[in-house]
Amino acid sequence: MILRRLLLAGSLLLATAFTSAKKADGPKISVTKFKDEPVNLFYFDDSDTVMFQDGKNGDVYVSRDAGANWDIVDVSGMRGKAWSLLPHPTDRTKAYIMSNGGTHWVTEDQAKSWREFTVDADLSRYEYPLVFHGKDSNRVMLLGHKCNGLDCKEKTYYTTDGFKTAHLLMENGRHCAWAVSTPTFGEGLDLPKEVNDRIFCVVSGLHSSWAEANRLLYSDRFFKDEQGTEVPLDNGRAVSGVIRTASVQKYILAATKSARTNELALFVTDNASTWHRTEFDGHRVEEDAYTILESTSYSLQVDVVSTYSSTIGTLFTSNSNGTYFTRNIEHTNRNMYGFVDFEKISSIQGIILVNTVKNWEDVEKSNGVQKKVISKISFDDGRTFQPLKVGKHDLHLHSVTDATNSGRVFSSPAPGLVMGVGNTGGHLKDYLDGDLFVSDDAGINLEEKLWTMLINMNSVIKASNWHKASLPDGVQIRAKVLTTAPGSTTLKFLLLGSAKADIGMEYYIISIDFAEMEDALVRRKTSKIGCQIERENEPDADGHKHPDAPEGVCKNPDDKFTGSSGFRLIPGNVCIREGGVDLDKQTERVCSETFKNPPAGQIVVEKSFFTADYYKDYFYLERKESSKGEDETVIMITSEQQIFLSRDHGKKWKQILEEEKITRIEPHRFFDDVAYFLTNNGDGWYTLDRGDTFRKFKAPLPPNQDKLPVLSFHPDRRDWLIWTGADECNGNGGNCHSVAYYTTNLGGEWHFLMRYVRRCEFISRDARGSSDKLVFCEQFENENPSNKHLQLLSTEDWFAEKRLHYSNILDFATMQEFIIVAIRGENSQDSLRIGVSIDGKTFADAELPANVQIPIQRAYTVLESRTHAAFLHVTINNIEDHEYGSIIKSNSNGTSYVLSLSAVNRNSRGYADFEKMQGLEGVAMANVVGNVADVENGAAKKFRTMITHNDGAEWTLMRPPDKDSEGRSYACSTKGGKPTDACALHLHSYTERADPRDTYSSPSAVGIMIGTGNVGDYLSLKSKADTFITRDAGITWEEVKKGKYQWEFGDSGSIIVLVPESTPTKTLLYSLDEGRSWKDFEFSEVEMQIQDISTVPSDTSRNFLLWGKEVGQGKKPGIATVNIDFSGLKERSKQCVLDEKKPEADDYYLWEPKHPLQPNGCLFGHRAKYHRKRPDKDCYNGRELQHLDSIGDICECTRSDYECDYNYEPQSDGSCARVAGLEPLDPKLVCTENPKAVEWYEPTGYRRIPLTKCQGGKQLNHIVAHPCPNKEEEFFKKHPRLRGIGLFFVILIPICLAATAGYYVYNHWDGKFGRIRLGETGSGGLFDRDSLLVSIPVSMVAGVVAVITALPLLVSSLWRSVSGYVRVPGGASSRRPYSSRDSFAARRSDYVGVVEDEDELLGTDDFDDDEEGDERNGQV
């Protein structure tokens, strides 16, 4: 039933037909007024019991007479604490009242009584708090969270007895659900018993908390004594980026999204064990762009947003197992909230009403076009649709997107009854212009009637006369909701409304009871119904499928296989097959019909030529793991401004946008499906689907003329852009300046943001908790570019309000976790300082290390920072061709910096020779200037390569191979297998690359790096370089080829290709076993000069692309690309098998990265295991593999888990010593910065590396603790101490025992002290010295002596312990008397002894010699 938006309820218009009134002339109306708005109103099914919640005051009301009278639920402790009221979805007797604390209440008898239960958590902030089992109403999960200060953990509890008891399921689970979440799940299937207990949980990634790393786990034992098993969603493999799961009828859906795309992958199961990826007939499914509609027990129905408009969709229906979807009808009408004009007619399967957009083409071209909506109906579950008719006229009805009432829009449980508001004509008009239309034959015929219906399960009453019933006491309301019991089995209705009060609003619930009029109602005569069938049980079919050949069948195009006919039986169709048309019978097909080409058994080459002098640039629009299709899209722009597109990795190219004068291509910085093509006049084109389609947009201004970025992209909102254009730049000079505009709909509408800007950027809200609208802009002060003073401003409302952060900045940079600003010095425009923010609102000045000698802070380079710490390169020497600087590393909030590595090379453009290994955290390489003193005097720079395995805390030279690729020894030698200044491996780095995308490592080839360089004392010329590889993240290296090569990884490292650099060639080298062996392959008959080799950025493809030109005899003019396709190679034609339960059983093994200086195999305090393909297996990895298998043991903390603290520096022995004359940061600041902090620690010179997960072991940063002000009580609860009488007896008792034993021995030992006996060999007496009764007490006597000797030390130690907790005036240990081994030695007379364990705390790690130690650590 639909309720008019503006229903005047001063009186009710009732459509009834009366005989002579025998009982009552009208319904009984009861009115109840409430001060606050009722929310969460619901009926207990098949009863007159109704409940709702007062959301403001926290009370719950109940009525047992269908709303005529109301009472507050008054249970001890409940009043005023109701946070939410939740009915059980499948048990009509149960409901839950949830508080915001840990105490809640449940009823199991329709609110007659309530039982209290508690859990140790508050309700979840993000999820519906209760998750119900579909078949056992006693099984419920509660999603909550628990906070300790700022540290909050998600906690999930479960019960199997209706919350008589509750147990912790897991911590930090993002979303959990029962496998059996609906009553219909598993119907018709023989499911294993354990499925009834199965729970699915979405949890964070092992190494990352970002959404793209989320995993889906399951457990059949409530996660007891196990971490759960990762669900093999895709062909037996786990998939990362799981957003959530949803249960619909008998199906469970899991949605996943990869990083850098909006496109989703949907996986489905109907048995909670076997999963399949859904296919939508070539249509993309994007995040927040699909709606799962009311479905049946035999198919799913999903509406998917069209490509460019969020308010137009396409309706799909699945086959019986939910895997393959076919299009039912296109251009369905949606709204921006995801609601779709779609409804199934109640009680009759297969009848669907939808609204579609008639002028969809105009709507997609322009956002301002008004939609023309038309209605259609289907009688075969959406396979075919036809117009709604009133006589000969088309009828259009308002549907879900216009609904203001709860429940169904058109139909009720009365079979065949359909009613709606709308109009006849060409399209749907305004709601207020509509009339009421009724059908009692399920929509076949509709009539315009001023009728209303009163419905119960057995009768339908029509009445053509309207009667008025006034509300009591002159009440006038604005109606909001008209509802009744869910099954429409009652003659009682509830009307909810509001009215203005003296202050604010007041709310009414009106009960309308027709029960007393029942005898006056005219019953509808039911005529005999016959079943008329045109053709007896004729089967119907629909839905084509693409033929897929069984694996291994198609070896040649002419081979044949038995496959799908292209038809399928309509899900839910129970027709009799015998004697009918069997269209879905499998048929014989030819292999050439399949999409995939049959394997050729060899590498395939495709060469293409272009009439240009050189290629200007190229970009990959990479299809991500959650994206559909098989394309590998590349876009190239040539020197002639021609743009070419290839969808098959360069095998075939086509020129695009030929008539447009495209001057630049801007790939989206955060979404790989998207690219923009810009002209100089402000016109532009973009693609959202990797070049499949293009759409034009008009910018508000031409691109800026200040060589600034024209487009700025939002990290999370694909359609949000900032355009920086040129204003008043008409060639006459004068006031030319840059102006920023923004759009939230891909340039459909532009809005002014700010003028006189240099740069504006969206700031990611991840980990900041900020608004999506957070924007930072650099604007010239007073809108005057001539003064060159830039101010940094931010806004969260498009600069309706703004915040000034700094008034004289040089630049700012944003990273995942930090915003870093370079500010000009107050006293000198040549000096800089650093400001840092995490939340984008509060900035703090960075504390730079004093041991970095910076005469004037002139330049900074913000380096890659993904490990909870910021890395900056600070320029020390800025003289051209002599540039170098220091890498400094921050703490976890980016404010306190320490020196990580000195004398790091930099070029004139500000780029530094620093690179982090991809796919493995904490490993990085850098090239340092090894002859700093000579460089300062004008000499050329000489480089050495350094490597770190603990995120910059320690750096070492790289160990060279023992032999070269020809089996010969190198001219230099290592010392004990360790590199020295005279003999180490050095590699050419970032500043020498023609293309910065050519990195040492790959995100998918974990642990493998390739580089060119040499073995010796310094890095030699690039022309003399050889090529090296490591397979263990840089611990050991091997020379693979003499000479310098360009390299590329493919298929996650299972294919590696080398091409000679700067040398004409016809051949390339490839390896299928991680570089252990190499084969030559001739890719061209004519020699070519190869400028670059590329593949998709994830390095997961088996295709490679060579970029160059022919130079040999018979060469063709222009430039050329060469596609090298390894997918047909026999050794790479079968996909590898990975069993998540037995990861080493088939084609993979588990690889553990290690720290070269730690014998226990720990890296960052844990042991991680990664999937790597066995080098000897002939198979391919395929789409991006989830490499990280598990994080195993958490390790005890060691020195490698710490780095030097602020104003401390590393020593040659590995310890950290305070820089002379400097003080550490005030340790008490933790108490003021965090009001919930209980304690602070005295500085030790060490701080934990932000990445480490270690526990226990050496706590080098926490030794002497002190209570924060006014937190003494909490402190001593956390650190109970021995004092008073207990301390007295601990000292006294051992002394008394030792003295007593000594006295006893002295008086009873026959030898006495002082007697000397020689030559006596007799057995001796009871107290002979060899007797146990003598030897033991002698030891005790020795103990007495030791105690007496050590007593001063004991007292001193106890004094230090006590004064460490509570400051004692005048204590000699009020300050720690040493900070390094040297200062400890200088004060040696102050100490009686040092326990052996304390040596490592001071940094006495063993090194082979001091000189080597100086090289490894002195440069840090």
UniProtKB/Swiss-Prot annotation:
<keyword id="KW-0675">Receptor</keyword>
<dbReference type="GO" id="GO:0006623">
    <property type="term" value="P:protein targeting to vacuole"/>
</dbReference>
<keyword id="KW-0333">Golgi apparatus</keyword>
<keyword id="KW-0325">Glycoprotein</keyword>
<feature type="repeat" description="BNR 2">
    <location>
        <begin position="377"/>
        <end position="386"/>
    </location>
</feature>
<keyword id="KW-0677">Repeat</keyword>
<feature type="topological domain" description="Lumenal">
    <location>
        <begin position="1353"/>
        <end position="1420"/>
    </location>
</feature>
<dbReference type="InterPro" id="IPR031778">
    <property type="entry name" value="Sortilin_N"/>
</dbReference>
<feature type="signal peptide">
    <location>
        <begin position="1"/>
        <end position="21"/>
    </location>
</feature>
<dbReference type="InterPro" id="IPR050310">
    <property type="entry name" value="VPS10-sortilin"/>
</dbReference>
<feature type="repeat" description="BNR 4">
    <location>
        <begin position="1028"/>
        <end position="1038"/>
    </location>
</feature>
<feature type="topological domain" description="Lumenal">
    <location>
        <begin position="22"/>
        <end position="1284"/>
    </location>
</feature>
<comment type="similarity">
    <text>Belongs to the VPS10-related sortilin family.</text>
</comment>
<dbReference type="InterPro" id="IPR031777">
    <property type="entry name" value="Sortilin_C"/>
</dbReference>
<dbReference type="GO" id="GO:0006895">
    <property type="term" value="P:Golgi to endosome transport"/>
</dbReference>
<feature type="compositionally biased region" description="Acidic residues">
    <location>
        <begin position="1397"/>
        <end position="1414"/>
    </location>
</feature>
<feature type="repeat" description="BNR 3">
    <location>
        <begin position="644"/>
        <end position="654"/>
    </location>
</feature>
<feature type="glycosylation site" description="N-linked (GlcNAc...) asparagine">
    <location>
        <position position="893"/>
    </location>
</feature>
<dbReference type="InterPro" id="IPR006581">
    <property type="entry name" value="VPS10"/>
</dbReference>
<protein>
    <recommendedName>
        <fullName>Vacuolar protein sorting/targeting protein 10</fullName>
    </recommendedName>
</protein>
<feature type="glycosylation site" description="N-linked (GlcNAc...) asparagine">
    <location>
        <position position="271"/>
    </location>
</feature>
<dbReference type="Pfam" id="PF15902">
    <property type="entry name" value="Sortilin-Vps10"/>
</dbReference>
<feature type="transmembrane region" description="Helical">
    <location>
        <begin position="1285"/>
        <end position="1305"/>
    </location>
</feature>
<keyword id="KW-0732">Signal</keyword>
<keyword id="KW-0812">Transmembrane</keyword>
<feature type="transmembrane region" description="Helical">
    <location>
        <begin position="1332"/>
        <end position="1352"/>
    </location>
</feature>
<dbReference type="GO" id="GO:0016020">
    <property type="term" value="C:membrane"/>
</dbReference>
<dbReference type="GO" id="GO:0005829">
    <property type="term" value="C:cytosol"/>
</dbReference>
<keyword id="KW-1133">Transmembrane helix</keyword>
<comment type="function">
    <text>Functions as a sorting receptor in the Golgi compartment required for the intracellular sorting and delivery of soluble vacuolar proteins, like carboxypeptidase Y (CPY) and proteinase A. Executes multiple rounds of sorting by cycling between the late Golgi and a prevacuolar endosome-like compartment.</text>
</comment>
<dbReference type="Pfam" id="PF15901">
    <property type="entry name" value="Sortilin_C"/>
</dbReference>
<feature type="region of interest" description="Disordered">
    <location>
        <begin position="1397"/>
        <end position="1420"/>
    </location>
</feature>
<dbReference type="GO" id="GO:0005794">
    <property type="term" value="C:Golgi apparatus"/>
</dbReference>
<feature type="repeat" description="BNR 1">
    <location>
        <begin position="61"/>
        <end position="71"/>
    </location>
</feature>
<feature type="glycosylation site" description="N-linked (GlcNAc...) asparagine">
    <location>
        <position position="321"/>
    </location>
</feature>
<feature type="repeat" description="BNR 5">
    <location>
        <begin position="1070"/>
        <end position="1079"/>
    </location>
</feature>
<feature type="topological domain" description="Cytoplasmic">
    <location>
        <begin position="1306"/>
        <end position="1331"/>
    </location>
</feature>
<keyword id="KW-0653">Protein transport</keyword>
<keyword id="KW-0472">Membrane</keyword>
<dbReference type="InterPro" id="IPR015943">
    <property type="entry name" value="WD40/YVTN_repeat-like_dom_sf"/>
</dbReference>
<dbReference type="GO" id="GO:0006896">
    <property type="term" value="P:Golgi to vacuole transport"/>
</dbReference>
<keyword id="KW-0813">Transport</keyword>
